[in-house]
């Protein structure tokens, strides 16, 4: 949260060069960006849109739009793969642990994003 707050405050500090939207690499950074915008007197999403990535449970509280990357499912699949490897007598499985797994993502639109206002 703190890193997102500091970075957003720096980006939004000069209104002449301020962006219309911020993409954050994690929801926690997004929470900080929303707070920084509010502390600078900006309205989210009227003045600045904020979107992040994770699908953190607190995202709903903050109204943060997010790209939910199914982290719980990813962790469960990783644990299952590890158990399979540890319990296997198959030398091929033990020697070839690289595996490509794709996950669906969900765009969760909440109140932190809006279309850019027209001038």
Residue ranges and their predicted role:
Residues 1:
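Conserved active-site histidine-acidic residue motif and adjacent donor-binding/catalytic loop
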Residues 9, 13-118:
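Flexible loop/turn connectors
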């Amino acid at each position: 949260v703190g890193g997102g707050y500091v970075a957003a405050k720096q980006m939004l500090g000069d209104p002449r060069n301020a962006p219309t939207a911020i993409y954050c690499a994690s929801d926690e950074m997004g929470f900080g960006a929303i707070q920084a915008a509010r502390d600078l007197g900006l309205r989210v999403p009227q003045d600045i849109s904020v979107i992040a990535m994770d699908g953190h449970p607190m995202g709903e509280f903050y109204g943060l739009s997010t790209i939910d990357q199914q982290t719980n499912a990813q962790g469960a699949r990783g644990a299952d793969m590890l158990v399979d490897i540890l319990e296997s007598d198959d030398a091929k499985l033990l020697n070839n642990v690289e595996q490509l797994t794709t996950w669906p993502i969900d765009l969760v639109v909440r109140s932190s994003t809006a279309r850019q206002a027209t001038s």
